């Protein structure tokens, strides 16, 4: 399984330095809003398969759209999710990590509208994250052809909601290849 690094990547030099440490993929988020060409630059240097764009979204009930946020979910970018993802693909992104930050860590289950959003982006691999409530839900989401992976945090780090840390692994056969 390839290891992906994300955080404070502001230049091709930053990305190259991390890859030289043995990391296969670079995930960028906030840096691309300051310099969208960073996607192309990293993709040209390291390859699109090593260029992961982390897209953090919040659902806007009034606009009935997912809006993209940067800076750990603190800053609205003005982009609607599909518009931003399409731009990232055009610039050379090879993979999208799409996170519903309203659901992240809540155990409420993934927002169905969020899953439908992912279905609209099928040109490159997409990993979904944010609110998975159970292994059964994870397996169900992974059955969609358009989902290449899931980001699971609390589900594999806690025994149950509001409980202490207890790393746990799904039993064999719960989530199939």
Residue ranges of model-derived segments:
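Short, well-ordered secondary-structure micro-motifs
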Residues: 16, 38-40, 63-67, 107-109, ...
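Short gly/pro/ser/thr-enriched loop/turn and capping motifs at secondary-structure boundaries
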Residues: 33-34, 60, 134, 156-159
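C-terminal helical cap(s) of enzyme catalytic domains, especially alpha/beta-barrels
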Residues: 38-45, 138-177
């Amino acid at each position: 399984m390839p290891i992906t690094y994300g955080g404070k990547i502001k230049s091709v030099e930053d990305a190259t330095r991390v890859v030289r440490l043995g990391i296969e993929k670079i995930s960028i988020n906030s840096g691309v809003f300051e310099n969208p060409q960073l996607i192309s630059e990293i993709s040209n240097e390291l390859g699109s398969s090593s260029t992961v764009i982390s897209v953090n979204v919040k659902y806007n009930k009034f606009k009935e759209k997912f809006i993209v946020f940067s800076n750990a979910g603190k800053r609205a970018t003005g982009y609607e999710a599909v518009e931003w993802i399409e731009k990232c693909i055009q610039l050379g992104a090879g993979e999208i990590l799409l996170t519903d930050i309203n659901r992240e860590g809540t155990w409420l289950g993934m927002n169905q509208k969020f899953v439908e959003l992912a279905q609209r982006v099928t040109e490159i691999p997409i990993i979904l994250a944010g609110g998975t409530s159970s292994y059964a839900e994870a397996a169900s989401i992974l059955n969609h052809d358009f989902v290449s992976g899931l980001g699971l945090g609390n589900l594999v780090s806690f025994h149950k909601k509001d409980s202490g840390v207890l790393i746990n692994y799904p039993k064999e056969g719960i989530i199939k290849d």
